[in-house]
Design a protein with these regions (language model features):
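Short, glycine-/small-residue-rich phosphate/pyrophosphate-handling segment
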Residues: 95-141
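Active-site-proximal loop->helix
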Residues: 24, 49-52, 79, 96-108
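Glycine-rich phosphate/diphosphate-binding loop of Rossmann-like nucleotide-binding domains
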Residues: 5-43
Length: 167
């Protein structure tokens, strides 16, 4: 299946790559095309600006921006595009990632960034798919099946618990 739009997964450093694997896995699971790039808001700001300004023209529909510490990548990318930007704060050695979370979530009016949990790459991938599903019924159906499957697993766990409680 070919989608009109793809997801850009931008990471601030190659050390963030293991954390974003969950986003890659979820995007692949739902059949959403994606590309990954390493761009630093602080070390390569011109590249961040260039990527963001041209993302829509290059076929992207959503940007996931993953960074730790002074995690300004999502905000910098959001400043130069009208595409939805999902900030993925990465746990750092300082404050267990709280510094990253606050850097991503505290955006000024007019420059919104959707934010997932610290190291919440699975949810970043799912949220990106949900955004694209607004204009793709097949993708929306796959997401609905995924959510139904999660509900079924909860129901099964509850049934097992109820059986255990009877004994």
């Amino acid at each position: 299946m070919v989608f009109l739009k793809k997801v850009a997964v931008i990471i601030g450093s190659d050390s963030d790559l293991p954390v974003v694997q969950g986003a890659f896995d979820k995007l692949a699971f739902f059949g959403v095309p994606y590309e990954a790039h390493i761009i630093s808001a602080h070390r390569s700001p011109a590249a961040a600006e260039n990527f963001s300004k041209n993302a829509a023209a290059n076929g992207f529909g959503v940007i996931i921006a993953a960074a730790g510490k002074a995690a300004h990548l999502a905000g910098v990318l959001a400043a130069y595009t009208t595409l939805p930007v999902i900030g993925l704060p990465i746990k750092s050695s300082t404050m267990d990632g709280l510094d990253s979370l606050l850097s991503v979530v505290q955006m000024p009016k007019g420059v919104p960034v959707a934010t997932v949990a610290i190291n919440g790459s699975d949810n970043a991938g799912i949220l990106a798919a949900q955004i694209l599903a607004v204009s793709d019924e097949d993708l929306a159906g796959r997401l609905l099946d995924f959510k139904r499957s999660m509900a079924e697993k909860v129901d099964e766990a509850d049934k097992k618990l109820q059986e255990t409680m009877k004994n």
